[in-house]
Amino acid sequence: MKLHVACGEVYLKGYVNIDIQGFVRQENAWKDPNETTFDNYYTKPLDFTPKDTRANFVIDERVNILLPWKWKDNTIDEVVMIQAMEHFTYFDGCYIVKEIHRVLKPGGKFVFDFPDIIETFNQYANDFDKLIRLLYCHYRDVFAAHKIGYNEETFTRLLKLENRTWSSIEFKEVVKHAYPTIGGVAVK
């Protein structure tokens, strides 16, 4: 089983797409999900215009990932979190990573990416509106706001808290974005 955690408006084919908001697919079979793949993760171009459309998307399950996850230990093949960890506080992130590590099978993958804050500053220093939008998000609601930033070093420390071990942690691009990001894969 593969989980797409905090999926937002992106419905990833072949994954159980979970978020705290959205229409659960069985409840609204009439609604066509924004279904996509890693190769075309974002089917819409980046839009800097604030909108109130957060809950108008389809998910498979509504899950609060800040509570104990329902999946048993060592049962999940892959967990994907794209542009999501920065939407949680540092302490919430600690809990989320703990749950991800718990549910992943040995050899299971945690695929992630998040904004590259330093490169964002470098590229958008002269465009304050875009800089603020990329750093803090659009703040349509409590979920659509950035609460922390990471770099490779701080994210690696987060992954290894409480002596968690990973067979490998590799930083690489996992999804194409129109703005600077840091991505990677951690293998349990």
Predicted feature locations:
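Conserved SAM-binding loop
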Residues: L3-N122, G184-K188
